[in-house]
């Protein structure tokens, strides 16, 4: 099983000592199968408000996964699937993507996870609505207790 963390989980890790400790314990068992999504990298970098935050993010998160060649990058197919997912949900639920911009990133993250066989670790309940349309992918709450 492979994993990637959603932005909300990594923000907690960066801000909260107990979340950082839980992440370290998780990585001690699963670092070899844990990836950083390029979608999450985008969101984290966009949220860095100071040069110090950006530097820390680059050194502590991005480079850690880049050096290990574990950055999950969505393909053109993942973008297409994400677009189809958003269109289906918009038609079913009566909303537009521009009214819910965070769902665009979430749809791309879900589609790329499915494409790569990666389980998403998240606290975001919006992913449950994707499961009704996007089959064959998994998301779990932090921190999964699975056997190696």
What residue spans do the PLM features occupy?
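Acidic, PIN/NYN-like endoribonuclease modules and their adjacent C-terminal/linker elements
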Residues: 110-148
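Active-site neighborhoods of divalent-metal-dependent phosphate/nucleic-acid chemistry enzymes
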Residues: 70-121
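Short, hinge-like loop/turn segments at secondary-structure boundaries
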Residues: 51-55, 89-90, 137-141
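Histidine- and aromatic-rich ligand-binding microenvironments
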Residues: 5-6, 37, 101-103, 124, ...
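Generic structural signal for small/hydrophobic residues in well-ordered secondary structure
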Residues: 6-7, 44, 82, 113
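A generic structural signal for short hydrophobic patches within well-formed alpha-helices
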Residues: 10, 41-44, 127-128
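Short, well-structured N-terminal submotif of metal-dependent ribonuclease cores
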Residues: 1-37, 46-64, 146
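Generic detector of contiguous secondary-structure segments
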Residues: 24-25, 60-80
């Amino acid at each position: 099983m492979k994993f990637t963390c959603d932005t909300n989980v990594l923000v907690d890790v960066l801000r909260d000592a107990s979340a950082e400790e839980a992440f370290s314990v998780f990585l001690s068992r699963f670092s070899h199968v844990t990836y950083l999504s390029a979608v999450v990298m985008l969101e984290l970098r966009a949220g860095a408000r100071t040069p110090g935050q950006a530097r820390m993010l680059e050194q502590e998160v991005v480079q850690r996964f880049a050096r290990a060649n574990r950055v999950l990058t969505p393909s053109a197919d993942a973008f297409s699937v994400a677009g189809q997912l958003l269109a289906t949900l918009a038609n079913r639920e009566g909303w537009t993507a521009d009214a819910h911009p965070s769902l665009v990133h979430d749809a791309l993250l879900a589609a790329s996870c499915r494409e790569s066989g990666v389980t998403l670790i998240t606290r975001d309940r919006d992913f449950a609505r994707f499961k009704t349309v996007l089959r064959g992918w998994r998301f779990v709450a932090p921190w999964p207790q699975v056997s190696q």
